[in-house]
From Swiss-Prot:
Every ATP-cone domain range: 49-139
Cofactor(s) needed: Zn(2+)
UniProt keyword Transcription present: yes
Keywords: ATP-binding, DNA-binding, Metal-binding, Nucleotide-binding, Repressor, Transcription, Transcription regulation, Zinc, Zinc-finger
Protein name: Transcriptional repressor NrdR
A GO molecular function held by the record: DNA binding
Length: 155
């Protein structure tokens, strides 16, 4: 591994540790030329399917974009960052399990809606209203009625 400080190509690994989830290795290294230390991370490279948008264009899957859209729906809601990350990981596992090279954005949207429904009902409704492009209040009301009839009432 090349030293980021002096560019020398010979470094020594001082310590290696596997992350808690088991998908990352953290290595502490020392440059044999300048004696400076640095950390590297080794991760499994996963190949997610390309996302086919409604207009037919294709974009690479981006975890950050998915996270941003979920955060927007969950804004000011009592859901932890950890819970959001876990939901995104479940979505990614489903995307990888499909084994497809391409997947329509609508399918990703449905996966997001399922996860949001489990996390927070208000966030689910927020996301669904934008995702399904409601044209008027009646469409919104239909979704709320569908949502209410499938959710048992407390009390």
């Amino acid at each position: 591994m090349k030293c980021p400080f002096c560019g020398h190509s010979s470094t020594q690994v001082l310590d290696s540790r596997v992350s808690e989830d088991g998908d990352t290795v953290r290595r502490r290294r020392r440059c044999e030329a300048c004696d400076r230390r640095f950390t590297t991370y080794e991760r499994i490279e996963l190949f997610f399917p390309a996302i086919v948008k409604k207009n037919g264009s294709r974009v690479d899957y981006a975890r950050a974009k998915l996270k941003d859209s979920m955060r927007l729906a969950l804004r000011k809601r009592p859901v932890s960052a950890e819970a959001i990350d876990e939901a995104i990981t479940r979505i990614e596992e489903k995307l990888l399990a499909l084994g497809e090279k391409e997947i329509p954005s609508s399918q990703v949207g449905e996966l997001v809606m399922r996860e949001l429904r489990k996390l927070d009902k208000i966030a689910y409704i927020r996301f669904a209203s934008v995702y399904r492009s409601f044209e008027d209040v009646s469409e919104f009301r239909e979704m709320l009625d569908e949502f209410s009839s499938s959710t048992p009432r407390k009390g």
